């Protein structure tokens, strides 16, 4: 009986070790490396969208780093999008002189890219649902 139990334990260990060794060999023998694929949002992050606030695609939370923008001025910018140039943001109707001066002082922090459906669908730009 001891012989059978020892044989069973030895076979189990051998099979277990073969499983660990086999996985490494399978990974080492992969002929083609797996290349990461970029989706539309990841690809947009490699443009100015990743470094500046995109007036056509950024949500309201992206404006928190700019003094005096969050939430009122940021929501006006989002509601009046899309823009063709950064300077068009100065033409938003109903802006006060203070808001216009804040916009002018921060024009270098903005960029304009084509609106992306992945980033602008629904009301996610006003309420992105991050709590």
From Swiss-Prot:
Pfam families: PsbU (PF06514). It is found in: Cellular thylakoid membrane. InterPro entries: PSII_PsbU (IPR010527). SUPFAM superfamilies: PsbU/PolX domain-like. Residues 29-36 form a propeptide. PSII is composed of 1 copy each of membrane proteins PsbA, PsbB, PsbC, PsbD, PsbE, PsbF, PsbH, PsbI, PsbJ, PsbK, PsbL, PsbM, PsbT, PsbX, PsbY, PsbZ, Psb30/Ycf12, peripheral proteins PsbO, CyanoQ (PsbQ), PsbU, PsbV and a large number of cofactors. It forms dimeric complexes. Belongs to the PsbU family. One of the extrinsic, lumenal subunits of photosystem II (PSII). PSII is a light-driven water plastoquinone oxidoreductase, using light energy to abstract electrons from H(2)O, generating a proton gradient subsequently used for ATP formation. The extrinsic proteins stabilize the structure of photosystem II oxygen-evolving complex (OEC), the ion environment of oxygen evolution and protect the OEC against heat-induced inactivation. May modulate the Cl(-) requirement for oxygen evolution. This is Photosystem II extrinsic protein U. It comes from Synechocystis sp. (strain ATCC 27184 / PCC 6803 / Kazusa). The lineage of its organism: Bacteria, Bacillati, Cyanobacteriota, Cyanophyceae, Synechococcales.
């Amino acid at each position: 009986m001891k012989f059978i139990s020892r044989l069973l334990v030895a076979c189990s260990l051998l099979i277990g070790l073969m499983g660990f060794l086999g996985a490494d060999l399978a990974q080492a023998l992969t002929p083609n490396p797996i290349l990461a694929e970029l989706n539309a949002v990841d690809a947009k992050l490699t443009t100015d969208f990743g470094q500046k606030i995109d007036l056509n695609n950024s949500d309201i939370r992206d404006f928190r780093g700019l003094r005096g923008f969050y939430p009122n001025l940021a929501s006006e910018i989002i509601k009046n999008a899309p823009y063709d140039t950064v300077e068009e943001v100065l033409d938003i109707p109903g802006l006060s002189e203070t808001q216009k001066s804040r916009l002018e002082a921060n024009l270098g922090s903005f960029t304009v890219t084509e609106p992306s459906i992945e980033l602008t669908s629904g009301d996610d730009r006003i309420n992105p649902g991050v709590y």
